[in-house]
Curated annotation (Swiss-Prot):
Keywords: Cytoplasm, Methylation, Protein biosynthesis. Belongs to the prokaryotic/mitochondrial release factor family. SUPFAM superfamilies: Release factor (SSF75620). One of its GO terms (molecular function) is translation release factor activity, codon specific. The keyword Protein biosynthesis applies. The keyword Transport does not apply. This is Peptide chain release factor 1. Coiled coil: none annotated. Its main location: cytoplasm. Pfam families: PCRF (PF03462), RF-1 (PF00472).
């Protein structure tokens, strides 16, 4: 492991020198590529440097222990050595995690699709609650969150389904564990007997695809236009600005009516289609790895119930990792960091175990 770390540090230093070369700076494509690689190695090199300093200090402390005759000084050195000895394995564990293979999709933006499931009107209201939860979390993270498509439910404030585009730093890598069935237990406002109802909504988080990721042939597309029910001023229900695209080979259908022009809706619909096809490719690749790692967190099995929101007890439980929190109101306001961090740590532990198996 340490030979690999030294090799990474050597490469990091070489890139650092190249980035100050005027010829490299003048070549913007090369400069961007090197700068991206530099950024990806920076955290590993910093952690390796910290480990190296700690190891050197520990070796020096051991040497002083052997040569120190003064009892008081010897006691101080032993105390320092004990602290360093305790710290070193933690730094080594951090390095192992940083060396784990990166999912190239983690750095991408994401599309979140939320659909009401079983439970009637209450499921539609819960889908709207989840949408607001993710919107608020995105706001806390400093991300951009835009609505791509929305279908309202039968009661005010409810949703049949909604698609959100979330843009920012490492969005997909942070949100990918949210894919799955989310269950809610609460007393509906219309319930006169005070009985708790159970309903559900499904969440799918897709990495946003770029045009180079997926080849889409024009002859494989059926494009329909229809009158928009969304914003658009005087054009609403008069001009066919909404767009529906069907990808014939896969059967995937996407639609967008949120923008004011047909061209804008078509561009957004194509973005959604590319992401769905890219997600399909990734899912096929992951099938071959399923026997190696069956963690529901990392495979994103959307058919499984991943989380329960129990409103009467103010409790959220993530069933994949046994995480429980009694801060349900805060979580519904977008305070998801403790939950997401627990999922990421579990994923890291699973991957470390797979690497050493």
């Amino acid at each position: 492991m340490f030979d690999k770390l030294q090799s990474i540090k050597d490469k990091f230093q070489t890139i650092e020198q190249q980035l100050s070369d005027p010829e490299v700076v003048a070549d913007q494509n090369r400069f961007r590529k090197l700068n991206k690689e530099y950024s990806s190695l920076k955290e590993i090199v910093r952690a390796y440097d910290e480990w190296s300093r700690t190891k050197k200090q520990l070796d020096e402390a051991h040497s002083m222990q052997k040569n120190e005759n003064d009892p008081e000084m010897r006691a101080l050195v032993e105390e320092e050595a004990g602290e360093l000895q305790e710290r070193l394995p933690k730094l080594e564990q951090q390095l192992k995690i940083l060396l784990l293979p990166k999912d190239e999709a983690d750095s991408r933006n994401a599309i979140i699709e939320i659909r009401a499931g079983t439970g009637g009107d209450e499921a539609g209201l819960f889908a709207a609650d989840l949408m607001r939860m993710y919107q608020r979390y995105a706001e806390r993270q400093g991300w951009s969150c835009q609505t791509l498509e929305v279908s309202e439910g039968s009661v005010p404030g409810s949703l049949k389904e909604v698609s959100l585009e979330v843009s920012g730093h490492n969005v997909y890598g942070i949100l990918k564990f949210e894919s799955g069935v989310h269950r809610v237990q609460r007393v509906p406002e219309t319930e006169t007997q005070g009985r708790i109802h159970t309903s559900a909504a499904s969440v799918a988080v897709l990495p946003e695809a770029e045009e180079v990721d997926v080849e889409i042939r024009k002859e494989d597309l059926l494009i329909d236009t229809f009158r928009s029910g969304g914003k658009g001023g005087q054009n609403v229900n008069k001009v066919e600005t909404a767009v529906r695209i069907t990808h014939v080979p896969s059967g995937i259908v996407v639609a967008c009516q949120e923008e004011r022009s047909q061209l804008q809706n078509r561009e957004r619909a194509m973005k959604m289609l590319r992401s769905k096809l890219y997600d399909l490719q990734i899912a096929e690749q992951q099938k071959s790895r399923a026997d190696l790692r069956r963690s529901m967190v990392t495979t994103g099995d959307r058919s499984a119930k991943i989380r329960t929101y129990n409103f009467p007890q103010s409790r959220v439980t993530d069933h994949r990792i046994g995480f429980t929190s009694h801060a349900l109101p805060q979580i519904m306001q977008g305070e998801l960091d403790p939950l997401i961090e627990a999922l990421r740590m579990h994923d890291q532990a699973e991957r470390l175990q797979a690497e050493t198996a």
